[in-house]
Amino acid sequence: MAKLRFMIKPSLREEKKLWRKGYKTVVCLDEAGRGPLAGPVTAAAVMIKISKSNLKSKILNLKSNLKGIKDSKKLSPKKRDEFYKILTKHPAIEWGIGIVSEKIIDRINIKNAAELAMEKALRNLNCKLQIANWGTEFLIIDGLNLKNNFLKKIRHRMIVKADEKVFSCAAASIIAKVTRDRIMRKLHKKYPQYRFDIHKGYCTKLHLARLQKFGSSPIHRKSFSPVLACNLNPKS
């Protein structure tokens, strides 16, 4: 018998469970750009604004406007941009962005940098929320083995592939990804020989060929093996 494959769609199940427990502020965090050889890592923090009087109507409105939302990696660039515009302007959604440069990535490693980007995203979100002491809030974070001290102090749950399962994490993944892609397109204008507009810094054949031909740029992650190898063995 052929195996049945079930498409997992992000839902509001996790958020609803926490809202029912009394957590009015449920923030979901996700990052974009762990794997690339160049450019920053970005993260987004997303929160759905709720109250007992408008919860049902807001959920119905979100589901209607954002039908088909999923992990950013499973969406076309066009669809990501469409969702980004809806998410960042939706009255029921608050969001913040965090960006950590390639220089800091090289200094503290990519895992720590990704978590720092999440911390920055949460702090930027809090500029809108104005929460003085994080105590009655809850975080849902995509990943495993949280190390960031600021995030660890807040009640949280780590979920592997949360961007595939949790609605607000999928939203965060889209905002983080579109933000980073836009940064890389701007960097392409400064370093056109690498074609960051095409591969966004990821380890593609095109990127490796350009890296081998031109050597690394100031925005390449010098601690990443392909960049390190290129710098140690430049093409003569």
Predicted features along the sequence, with ranges:
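RNase H-like, Mg2+-dependent phosphodiesterase core
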Residues: 1-54, 59-236
